[in-house]
């Protein structure tokens, strides 16, 4: 790994439809092979489906879902005296969002619905209701952190 300076974080521009940076980041997560237009269509169609299904603003449902997905604690491996310990640590805000989006998109891709927009819409609605695979991933992460609470004093 290079020991040079860390590359500066690039600013993400808000998307044109919802004027939200987190929606832009979702589009970037959904995007495959650089096809941003296709990814944007999938996300916007999913948001339309959410609006039709719930009757409320899709962005509010999405933000509720993200709050339910984003982890507060995670475990990191720490080597102490020849053995590895899973040490629970708090998750930084930027990483919380990144993990939440990653888990949401991965859970959507693993679903059985026919189109990606349907999978994404259903996963967002499930997450907003505190169900679904992405919320389960968060619960598992928190459970691991709780189980390894005894090693919290190894935090760095």
Swiss-Prot record:
Domain of life, per lineage: Bacteria
Q: What's a Gene Ontology MF term here?
A: structural constituent of ribosome
In terms of SUPFAM superfamilies, this protein maps to: Ribosomal protein S7 (SSF47973)
Keywords for this protein: Ribonucleoprotein, Ribosomal protein, RNA-binding, rRNA-binding, tRNA-binding
Supply one GO CC term from the record: small ribosomal subunit
InterPro entries, sorted: Ribosomal_uS7, Ribosomal_uS7_bac/org-type, Ribosomal_uS7_CS, Ribosomal_uS7_dom, Ribosomal_uS7_dom_sf
GO terms classed as biological process = translation
Signal peptide range: none
Which Pfam family name is an example for this entry?
Answer: Ribosomal_S7
Stored CDD domains: uS7_Bacteria
Instruction: Say what the protein does.
Output: One of the primary rRNA binding proteins, it binds directly to 16S rRNA where it nucleates assembly of the head domain of the 30S subunit. Is located at the subunit interface close to the decoding center, probably blocks exit of the E-site tRNA.
What do we know about how this protein assembles, alone or with others?
Answer: Part of the 30S ribosomal subunit. Contacts proteins S9 and S11.
**Similarity field:** Belongs to the universal ribosomal protein uS7 family.
Q: What is this protein called?
A: Small ribosomal subunit protein uS7
């Amino acid at each position: 790994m290079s020991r040079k300076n860390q590359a500066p974080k690039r600013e993400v521009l808000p998307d044109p439809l919802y004027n939200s940076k987190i929606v832009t980041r979702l589009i970037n997560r959904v995007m495959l092979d650089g096809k941003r237009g296709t990814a944007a269509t999938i996300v916007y169609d999913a948001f339309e489906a959410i609006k039709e299904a719930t009757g409320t603003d899709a962005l509010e449902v999405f933000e509720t879902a993200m709050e339910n997905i984003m982890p507060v604690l995670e475990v990191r491996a720490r080597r102490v005296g020849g053995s590895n310990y899973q040490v629970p640590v708090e998750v930084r805000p930027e990483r919380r969002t990144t993990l939440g989006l990653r888990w949401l998109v991965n859970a959507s891709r693993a679903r059985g619905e026919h189109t990606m927009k349907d999978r994404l819409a259903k996963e967002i609605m499930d997450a907003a209701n505190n169900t679904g695979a992405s919320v389960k991933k968060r619960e598992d992460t928190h459970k691991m952190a709780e189980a390894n609470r005894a090693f919290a004093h190894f935090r760095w």
